[in-house]
Amino acid sequence: MNTHTPPLRIALICDWFRPRVGGIEIHLQGLAEGLTRAGHEPHVITATPGPATDYPFPVHRLAVPVTERFGFVYTPAPFIQIQALLRRLAFDVVHCHSSILSPLTYGSLYLAKRLGLPAVMTCHSVLKYYWGLFLVADRLWGWSRWPVLFSAVSPTAAAFLEKAGRMAAVHILPNAVHSDRWRLPEVQKDPDEILLVSVMRLSIRKRGHTLIRLLPELLRQCPPNRRLHLTIVGDGTQKPRLERLVCRLGLQGVVDLPGVLDQTVIAALFARSDIFVLPANQEAFGVAALEARSAGLPVVGMGRSALSHFIRHGVEGLLAADDGELGKHLLSLIHDDESRRHIARHNRTTATEWTWESAISRHLELYAQARQERDRFNGQRLCRIRGNEP
């Protein structure tokens, strides 16, 4: 039980949750588990269909239709159900989690405001090409002036959210990991084989096709006595396209697309792999890269993404300015065993600061601020009402 904060009942609202797999779903599960361990009562509210009994916290799956491809709600029904839940369960805080387009989350944030509930919103995406649309919406509806604490999962994501509205501040509520779940005992590796691994949602923005297209050149420049293999874990709308690309490039047997894997299976895959690579250049955080770094893998990714907040070039991994440099960094680690092992040794023996223990403390601080903000807003509204009395 958390002795510093009275137990809170917290609504964690998101368009998506498990069994769908991605950074936002993994984050939501980790947050709910961490809050439960700290003695609080989180409730996940989502439109994603699935079981409600597989978790140590309540999961409310709304009985509403969603689009097949992206899982978006498109009727008023979910908001009627959410309003009833918010009223019946008397939440202390409502914490909404958004991507770029999150109709359930945005509508729920409005409901929390209308019901006078303390509210926090966390943005899990980089609004690089979309912040202007949010700014127009703010001019129309003034969402950034609501009594809500706005946050993002990294400074990279926060910078674009700040441009999208007129809020006083955007707080940072980062992703996190349980390091001990990823740091498995070292396994004996084949010195003649280099195993590359990536974990991502197979969407266009994640750029799995870019990674696969690098493989022919990597194979051409690979030492003659060394075999190369790439595993891309994940599922999504681009999987058929990636499978066709693998066949067209003749990479069957070199590239494996196993789909969604359980985290324990991914941890075992990390333990026997040599390099983790994440080609996305608009990554809001990159929790899979943090998990791989915690497992002891050198991480290769794009320097313009949020990886730069927890991967230092030459220390935890290598960061590229463009796709050509991404390929060069991979080749350097494929050829240079000592550099690769040096980074891996650092990652295995140096704990990351991005743990759920510290993240939960930060969340609780922001929840307390949200309750204060709600009280301040209500006090100002009461003063205005009294000022208008005859």
Q: Which sequence ranges carry the predicted segments?
A:
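Nucleotide-activated donor-binding/catalytic signature segment of Leloir-type glycosyltransferases, i.e.
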Residues: 241-261
